[in-house]
């Protein structure tokens, strides 16, 4: 219900533009992030459902990039020490049983929404809605074990069913 590192509400879809922001979302000097405990719990639940190892230590990294969709100039993400790693998901596609290895399940914060405006003349410009910035984003990273579109569909269908069952999605 809240963003990844602050208490702003995460229901940005129907909210007025830039109404779900705070100094933490904007990365203003002197602000400190506080982790969303529920997002961590959901990620660990997902990892366990995928047979992942849950390490005792994890960390978040600061991924720097200068794009306009992230006001602070960096994204808080995980890479080398995720919340869950080394899992698998067994699927059936085209009558064949397959195992898709899951490299990791990690958390990061989503970026802002860009809206490109082009009225047909030379005043084309982009608008930034920061409401989505900081919303928890869980990523499931699989190994390249899927060989056909049918296997990819079976993988995503089963993963979606698991996330729905857990109440994570």
What do these predicted regions represent?
Residues 1-169:
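Basic, nucleic-acid-interacting segments
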């Amino acid at each position: 219900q809240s963003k990844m590192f602050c208490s702003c509400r995460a229901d940005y879809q129907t909210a007025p533009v830039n109404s779900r922001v705070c100094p933490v979302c904007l990365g203003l000097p002197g602000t400190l992030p506080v982790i969303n405990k529920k997002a961590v719990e959901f990620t660990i639940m997902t990892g366990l459902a995928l047979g992942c190892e849950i390490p005792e230590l994890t960390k978040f990294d600061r991924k720097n990039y200068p794009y306009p969709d992230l006001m602070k100039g960096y994204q808080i993400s995980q890479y080398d020490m995720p919340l869950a790693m080394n899992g698998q998901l067994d699927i059936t596609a085209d009558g064949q049983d397959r195992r898709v290895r899951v490299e990791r399940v990690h958390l990061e914060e989503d970026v802002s929404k860009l809206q490109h405006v082009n009225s047909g003349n030379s005043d084309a410009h982009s608008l930034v809605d920061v409401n989505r910035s900081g919303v928890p984003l869980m990523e499931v990273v699989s190994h390249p074990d899927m060989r056909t579109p049918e296997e990819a569909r079976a993988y995503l269908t089963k993963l979606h069913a698991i996330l729905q069952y857990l109440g994570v999605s």
